[in-house]
């Protein structure tokens, strides 16, 4: 394993700063008691709720660092200042405060259990439940633990925090860094994103990014059918519930949090210099070779205009700043509660000429008017994204690096023009693309506007019986203006024009999405003896409309006109609109017998406009139960076991994500119909319908347990599950005579199984001024296609095939490199000499297995060579605090996974080469780890290019100090002040060189924007 980041100078600087911070802040903590002349000696004993002595309870003079801990008998002695207050605390119990006077110097303290910990609740579908009463598999994140992470996208804070939830950052381009989230594997061939609800309103993963972390109270993930089936047809991929903060009955509290951060790429490719690159090019193209004189100039740098040494990755990327400022006010009376917040966020991208700016606001209001409760949630955001007119990923700027640039060309010539040629006259400028020119050429303004509103009313009809009705409205608009200039003539180093003036073009894109949601829910809670019941019945209806419009025009007089009326030629306008609606009836029954036996039943009946009338409605039930063993009498004497709950569940879910009109015969306008001698506008069939399609259905079986040991200091959760998806909608191959030029229609044909396990454990303890915590999570899943009606779906380097995982890697099986004559003379089982594409292989070529045993390596020898699913994902956290000083670390990683690290071996269009190619095969280096350069046979997708993608990453490190109730702060009206240093992705251990190991399996060519490493300083102030 290679430790990639520790040796970087910037990291050393930051770690040094962290150490200085550790020693400097505690030194500022001058005890207020040291300034007091009069002292009282206080003594006492601390007992728990059962009368047993509490060992290690913290006894601290409030507002100071003067403190002690109770001994083995629960006793303590402490000298304090006159007229002071002491605070006594212990894990699992509520803090207690005592005012010290001459008449109150001996204390007998009985701690009371912390009811918030006992009654810890978790947000579930359409409500909350006590954690101890959950029968399904629900994981939750308290955002107090992660809110200070210096990330641009709030969703990234969830990475590694939830077992069974895999979050992958596929690049960190400013404004385009929404991660991929998969819950318990991949269940279908398309559309595997989970359902997301923010304060009960359906949203998306990308919208989580727009919520300031300081606004979020908690995030719950519903992983099994028992917990998710209440959402029916949208819940097959799991459900993420985001709950924002609300006000309470308290005086107004103003909170400010701000941070400033520096970002840099986690890793940039280690490209060879121009001299080494030119030698590689000569091996591939001897007819276009760099001469000895040219090579000499590349070595000595004597002619930088014609023989440069450019590191294009370092020219494209930079260290960039990021800062955010969040202000909130919350409070309320008995009748009215409020929480109002706003945030400003500014990020300069590490890719030059990119940036992301966002403004957010949120207002959550609650009013209690007798038996009626009213609420109003309002939130909105405005986001401006600066980006180049050329795309960054895919075939954009990142592809330029790997395929179309070479280090022998300068960024700019000395005459100021962008570089496109070097001094080798045999290489055309047409194969070169200058990414720095692309970053600076043209104009692109990408604006996003979002507004969400929800009004709800709730009435207490009678004891335990409530009715709640809500109306929500969602508005999202995206406007993109792109201008490509005409003044993009290419020149050589002497100023000669290589191309002519082009035609400029302005494109305006407009997208609008609006949604209305109405929900009506009736709940009834009642008990009969030891029998407790909770009933829920509801109805929901929602409608969504999407509008898209795009217009473009060319022929503008100058490159400074960004209005459509300024164009003179090639008008082009397109537009479309779609609508969908969903109606649902749902219900839930919770039964609790004596706090020991739990039963839950859910059912949802969904009707979707996306399905044909014959299959428009479907029902999705679930059943779950649990046994809390530790509430049984026979477990009373098992002292070390605080709680033990066994769980089991089964349920059915659905998936409607196939587009809005998959079953219908849609039409499209066309101007290609002739009547007489002229073309006329007409209508044509856009796709072939299938009125027999129905829901994709997922059933999940889950067994697990939740256990707590030694008074709740250690908590363990385990789950085993099997998730089977059937009737998967896919496009089966059909005869071309039937399809014509259209795609095949969707049919219900596939089946997929995901079988996996999850384990999580956490430990927390406290002794006096010291507290520490540790935890870990492990999970694994095996994905398998169990039925595809005998059809195979091959796409580039992946395949969907029965018995294999979705998106399995498909290519030739590499068994080495031809290094000797004996290798060249190898034969197959039939004694045939093995050719490659009917040609004799050469020394240095990659050697492939002859799968079909016909003596010739070609596409027929492709086979499954791996799959994109890791065998295990894991995380662990370690942290401690001493008085007001705290340190927390969080590590995350995956194991047992392979990623493509493919590279073009012919250098046909130029393209930078990484340093691994310095160890390529050659006559002077016959044992090289890389094949020879040149020869298209080595370009084949094969297992040779699969690299172990395991990694372990220090995802977050935070060191902080909190000033509480200091005299100098109290005078300023400050309740508390926290200063902290934090970093993300500080260390990475991996065997994958040159590229970040945290990437999607679909990134076979390393065309993705790098991820970022971040260093930040932050402050939290509460008034």
What are these regions (language model features)?
Residues 286, 298, 303, 484-492, ...:
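Surface-exposed, extracytoplasmic segments of Gram-negative outer-membrane nutrient-acquisition systems
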Residues 1-362, 366-368, 372-381, 392-393, ...:
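Short, small/polar-rich motifs associated with maturation and membrane association
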Residues 264, 268-294, 381-426, 482-484, ...:
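A surface-exposed, glycine/aromatic-enriched loop/edge motif typical of exported proteins
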Residues 46, 61, 69, 195, ...:
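Hydrophobic beta-strand positions
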Residues 242, 855-860, 959, 1019:
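Residue-level detector of buried hydrophobic side-chain packing
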Residues 146, 186, 193, 320-323, ...:
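Extracellular/periplasmic, surface-exposed regions of secreted and cell-surface proteins
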């Amino acid at each position: 394993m290679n430790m990639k980041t520790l040796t970087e100078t910037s990291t050393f600087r930051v770690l040094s700063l962290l150490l200085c911070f550790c020693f400097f802040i505690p030194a500022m903590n001058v005890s207020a008691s040291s300034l007091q002349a009069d002292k009282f000696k206080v003594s006492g004993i601390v007992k728990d709720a059962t009368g047993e002595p509490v060992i290690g309870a913290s006894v601290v003079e409030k507002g100071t660092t003067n403190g002690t801990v109770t001994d083995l008998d629960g006793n303590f002695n402490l000298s304090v200042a006159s007229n002071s207050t002491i605070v006594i605390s212990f894990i699992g119990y509520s803090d207690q405060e005592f005012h010290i006077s001459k008449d109150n110097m001996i204390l007998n303290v009985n701690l009371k259990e912390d009811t918030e910990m006992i009654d810890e609740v978790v947000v579930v579908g359409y409500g909350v439940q006590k954690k101890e009463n959950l029968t399904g598999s629900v994981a939750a994140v308290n955002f107090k633990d992660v809110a200070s992470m210096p990330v641009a996208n709030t969703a990234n804070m969830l990475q590694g925090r939830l077992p069974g939830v895999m979050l992958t950052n596929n690049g960190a381009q400013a404004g385009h860094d929404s991660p991929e989230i998969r819950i318990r594997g991949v269940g279908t061939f398309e559309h595997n994103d989970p359902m997301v609800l923010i304060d009960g309103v359906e949203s998306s993963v990308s919208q989580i990014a727009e919520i300031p972390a300081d606004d979020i109270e908690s995030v719950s993930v519903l992983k099994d059918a028992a917990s998710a089936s209440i959402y029916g047809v949208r819940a097959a991929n799991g459900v993420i519930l985001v709950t924002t903060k609300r006000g309470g009955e308290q005086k107004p509290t103003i909170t400010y949090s701000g941070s400033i951060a520096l970002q840099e790429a986690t890793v940039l490719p280690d490209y060879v210099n121009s001299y080494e690159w030119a030698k590689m090019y000569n091996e591939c193209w001897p007819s276009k070779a760099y001469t000895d004189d040219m090579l000499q100039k590349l070595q000595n740098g004597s002619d930088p205009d014609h023989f440069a040494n450019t590191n294009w990755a370092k020219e494209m990327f930079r260290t960039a700043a990021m800062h955010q400022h969040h202000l909130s006010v919350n409070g309320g009376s008995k009748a009215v509660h409020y929480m109002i917040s706003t945030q400003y966020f500014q990020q300069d991208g590490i890719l030059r000429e990119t940036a992301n700016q966002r403004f957010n606001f949120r207002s959550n209001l609650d009013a209690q008017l007798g038996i009626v409760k009213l609420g109003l949630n309002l939130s909105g955001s405005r986001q401006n994204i600066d980006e180049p007119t050329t795309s960054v990923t895919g075939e954009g700027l990142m592809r330029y690096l790997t395929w179309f640039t070479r280090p022998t060309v300068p960024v700019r010539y000395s005459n100021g023009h962008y570089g496109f040629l070097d001094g080798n006259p045999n290489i055309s400028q047409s194969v070169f693309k200058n990414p720095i020119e692309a970053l600076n050429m043209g104009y692109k303004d990408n604006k996003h506007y979002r507004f969400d509103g929800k009004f709800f009313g709730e009435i207490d009809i009678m004891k335990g019986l409530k009715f709640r009705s809500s109306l929500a409205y969602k508005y999202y608009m995206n406007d993109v203006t792109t201008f490509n200039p005409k003044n993009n003539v290419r020149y050589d180093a002497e100023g000669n024009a290589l191309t002519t003036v082009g035609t400029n073009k302005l494109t305006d894109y407009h997208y609008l999405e609006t949604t209305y949601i109405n929900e009506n829910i009736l709940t009834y809670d009642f008990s009969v003896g030891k029998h407790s019941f909770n009933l829920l019945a509801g109805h929901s209806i929602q409608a969504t409309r999407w509008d898209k419009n795009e217009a473009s025009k060319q022929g503008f007089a100058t490159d400074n006109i960004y209005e459509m009326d300024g164009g003179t030629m090639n008008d082009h306008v397109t537009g479309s609109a779609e609508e969908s609606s969903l109606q649902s009836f749902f219900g839930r029954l919770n039964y609790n017998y004596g706090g020991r036996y739990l039963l839950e039943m859910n059912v949802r009946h969904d009707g979707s406009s996306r399905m044909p009338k014959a299959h428009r409605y479907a029902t999705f039930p679930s059943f779950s139960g649990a046994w809390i063993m530790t509430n049984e009498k026979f477990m009373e004497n098992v002292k070390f076991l605080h709680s033990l709950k066994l769980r089991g569940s089964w349920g059915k879910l659905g998936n409607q994500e196939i587009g809005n009109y998959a079953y219908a015969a849609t039409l499209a306008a066309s101007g290609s119909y002739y009547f007489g001698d002229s073309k006329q506008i007409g209508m044509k069939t856009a796709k072939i319908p299938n009125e027999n399609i129905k829901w994709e259905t997922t059933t999940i079986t889950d067994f697990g347990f939740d256990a707590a040991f030694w008074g709740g200091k250690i908590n363990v959760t385990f789950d085993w599950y099997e998730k089977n998806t059937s009737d998967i909608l896919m496009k089966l191959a059909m005869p071309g005579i039937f399809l014509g030029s259209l795609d095949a229609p969707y049919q219900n044909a596939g089946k997929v199984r995901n079988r996996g396990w999850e384990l999580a454990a956490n430990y927390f303890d406290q002794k006096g001024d010291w507290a520490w915590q540790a935890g870990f999570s492990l999970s694994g899943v095996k994905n398998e296609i169990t039925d595809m009606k005998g059809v195979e779906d091959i796409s580039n380097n992946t395949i969907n095939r029965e018995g294999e995982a979705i998106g399995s890697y498909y290519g030739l099986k590499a068994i080495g490199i031809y290094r000797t004559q004996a290798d060249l003379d190898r034969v197959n089982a039939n004694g045939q000499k093995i050719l490659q594409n009917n040609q004799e292989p050469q020394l240095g070529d990659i050697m492939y297995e002859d799968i079909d045993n016909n003596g010739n390596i070609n596409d027929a020898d492709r086979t499954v060579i791996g799959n994109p699913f890791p065998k295990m994902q894991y995380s662990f956290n370690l942290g401690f605090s001493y008085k007001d000083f705290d340190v927390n670390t969080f590590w995350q990683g995956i194991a047992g996974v392979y990623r493509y690290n493919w590279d073009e071996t012919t250098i046909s269009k130029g393209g930078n080469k990484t340093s691994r190619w310095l160890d390529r095969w050659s006559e002077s280096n016959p044992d090289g780890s890389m094949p020879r350069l040149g020869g298209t046979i080595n370009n084949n997708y094969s297992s040779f290019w699969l690299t172990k993608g395991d990694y372990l990453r220090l995802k977050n490190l935070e060191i902080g100090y909190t000033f509480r109730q200091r005299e100098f702060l109290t005078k300023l009206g400050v309740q508390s002040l926290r200063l902290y240093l934090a970093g993300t992705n500080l260390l990475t251990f991996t065997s994958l060189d040159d590229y970040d190991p945290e990437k999607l399996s679909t990134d076979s060519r390393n065309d993705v924007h790098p991820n970022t490493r971040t260093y930040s300083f932050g402050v939290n102030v509460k008034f």
